[in-house]
Amino acid sequence: MKVNDIDMDAVILGNGEYPTHSMPETMLIMAPYVVCCDGSADEHIRRGFTPDAIIGDGDSLSPENKERFRTIFHQIDDQETNDQTKAVHFLLDQGKKTIILVGATGKREDHTLGNISLLIDYMKAGAQVTMLTDHGMFIPASGRNCFKSYPGQQISIFNFNATGLRADGLVYPLSDFSNWWQG
């Protein structure tokens, strides 16, 4: 997959590990609109970039950047959702539906698992979301889908209640898995 194969309205930078692989790093640089999740703005700004918006409860954003970027900082104190979810809904409210998530993994495994698991919720909310990491990508899907691939590419399918799974050209057959991690 190449950078120009991915369409996007915006990129959300999570507060996990800052991207180092060229794919998520390039997406972040080329993005037409960048939303930083709370404290991720500190690292993004330190690297010489200015986000279009900073979203979160403000618990990890430095006081200096909170003040300096107060016009683009949207503080949402709700503790029932994480900052990534707040950022997705912020973008959906603006009509930005094709969203790339970067920096959403690493540092904390509980946040990594949570952020990956939330992709299904974002899809159900109307977002066309792709999570790019330094090691791969996650794409939530429903219904009939076709994905570009190449011989030898590693592919994992996490099944969240789908039935009748079918694929052509995979080494291992698909079935209606009983657990999400089996694919």
Set out the residue ranges of the language-model regions.
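N-terminal beta-strand-loop-alpha-helix module at the start
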Residues: 1-68
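A glycine-rich helix N-cap at a beta->alpha junction
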Residues: 71-77, 128-130, 156-158
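Short phosphate-binding loop-to-helix
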Residues: 73-95
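Short Gly/Thr/Asp-enriched flexible loops that form oxyanion-binding sites at enzyme active sites
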Residues: 110-120
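Short, acidic/small-residue loops that bind anionic groups at enzyme active sites
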Residues: 121-138
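Long, charged alpha-helical interface segments
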Residues: 136, 141-183
